[in-house]
A protein has these predicted regions:
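Acyl-donor binding region in acyl/amide transferases
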Residues: 33-68, 72-208
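Short, charged, solvent-exposed linker or helix-capping segments at domain edges/interfaces
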Residues: 210-214
Length: 214
């Protein structure tokens, strides 16, 4: 029988992450807005604590190849992002790309999922979400190549309309291509039921559909 690997609890801080102070009303007024790629133990703990305390889906675990970022400013920690493996099958995404089943299996690693995106609930700063999205999309392909030896060409993300309208994705020039089928990532037998979500895509390379179908 296959041995089950025990899951360990995520590393956390001993107290909540401090709230940012004196944050301006618009992202353009933040002088030192940075994305920090999570690497050190301290950064892992901050990211986990933020997600566990403030993101509706918690810290994970994320699936497959992954890169995580913290959003830092001179005012404090503003949130975080996590990129991980894409959905195995996604009808509207696969149709937009033009995939058949064999090509999808061969090229699926070139698509990554923005599986966590948190602007802290206490942060109210105009255009911050779309600005941070843009910053992450400019560095994530390089960071994936540095860590895993290949470049992703497309990012997908899911938006639950009961919680969000997708405005920040639209402002950052993502493309809405349809809806998910309301099943989990590994639900091959149609047994799970989760809310259907809007699917947004963002190309990280030119001619992305042709590349993914080659």
């Amino acid at each position: 029988t296959r041995r089950q690997t025990p899951q360990t609890d995520p590393r956390r801080l001993t107290k909540p992450v401090e709230e940012p102070l004196n944050l301006p009303s618009a992202a353009g007024k933040i002088q030192e807005l940075q994305l920090i790629r999570v690497q050190t133990d301290a950064e892992v703990r901050i990211w986990n604590e933020l997600m566990i305390q403030e993101h509706p889906r918690g810290a994970g675990p994320l699936v497959g190849a992954q890169i995580r970022y913290l959003i830092r400013s001179e005012h404090g920690w503003l949130g975080g992002l996590g990129f991980s493996a894409s959905a195995l099958q996604l009808k509207d995404r696969d149709r937009w790309i033009g995939w058949d089943a064999q090509t999808r299996r061969q090229q699926l690693h070139r698509v990554i999922n923005l599986s966590r995106f948190l602007i802290r609930p206490s942060v109210h700063c105009h255009n911050l979400a779309s600005r941070v999205l843009g910053m992450s999309l400019r560095c994530v392909a390089d960071d994936f190549e540095l860590r895993y030896g290949y470049r992703p060409w497309l990012v997908e993300s899911f938006v639950d309309q009961s919680r969000h309208t997708g405005t920040c994705y639209q402002a950052a020039n993502w493309r809405r291509v349809g809806q998910s089928a309301g099943r989990g990532r590994n639900d091959r037998h149609h047994r799970l039921s989760v809310p259907a979500k809007d699917i947004y895509l963002y190309p990280l390379a030119r001619n992305v559909q042709r590349r993914l179908c080659d």
